Amino acid sequence: MDTLIQQLINGVMLGSIYALIALGYTMVYGILRIINFAHGDILMVGALTTLSAINALNTTFPHMPLLLQLGVALAVAMAVCALLAIAVERFAYRRLRNAPRLAPLISGIGVSVLLQTVAMIIWTRNPLMFPQILPMEPIAVTSGSDIDPPAIVTVTGIVTVVLALAVMTGLWLLVEYTRLGRGMRAVAENPRVATLMGVNPNAIITLTFAIGGVFAALAGVMMASNYGNASFSMGFLPGIKAFTAAVLGGIGNIRGAMIGGILLGIIEALGAGYLGELTHGVFGSNYQDVFAFMVLILVLVFRPAGLLGERVAHRA
């Protein structure tokens, strides 16, 4: 039982990060009906920019508290990622809105490779240590037993889940109850009619990409804080998994991204925790990535609209 609880805790923490990344995919798809495969690499830029900003602040203001350094650095990274996302939309996607669907897909992959290459040149190939901001001492949530150790959680993990849920809830409220949200839904439904109603589709699309960039920066810092390092390649695989989470929940739907992210994290954690036992050691936890792609294949085959269905996914 302690092992099960531990894997569920791990899954919720991991799934919160996936869900936050998936929001970027689902927002863009909801409006433009394209998949921004450069989104995961914007996450990477956010994490590495935060790290560079912390190092610069530590050099310039050595007595500044580390938590304050993180706040300032995160604000800088969010601004950088928002501008980067706007640039990606402007130069990689805007002229391809009416092109065949394969064209923006190839363009997004090209931007992804470009961002990774530039990041590798700036920050080198080697993973860089990310500073420990919050206490990493484990907190026991169960008493354990003679067979299983107690299930644990860290302060960083708790903050990750709480912050992700708060951000996701805030986005849902923004989309449902604000003028900007009404504009986003109008453009998603019919850009031409939205224009006749006084909505500027280009401005809405630009803001959507910017918000996605901010979320990517936050997710990148969450990942780097939990794993203790950041690298030029850190965004690709989580980006693909977050895309899987968006498809699982119903791509284009904000609630679907939340649900899909949490579910995918739990599935992956349970698979990693029990795969070795079920296969008698033939496969270990290093095969956990297989579960994410199995989920993607199964959803595309049996329920392409995702868990929340085509109607809801289309409207969000």
Language model regions located:
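Single transmembrane alpha-helix segments in multi-pass membrane proteins
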Residues: 4-53, 87-103, 246-254
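Transmembrane helix-bundle core of multi-pass membrane transporters
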Residues: 96, 104-177, 204, 270-289, ...
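Membrane-embedded helix boundary and interhelical linker motif in transport proteins
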Residues: 31-87, 91, 150, 274-282
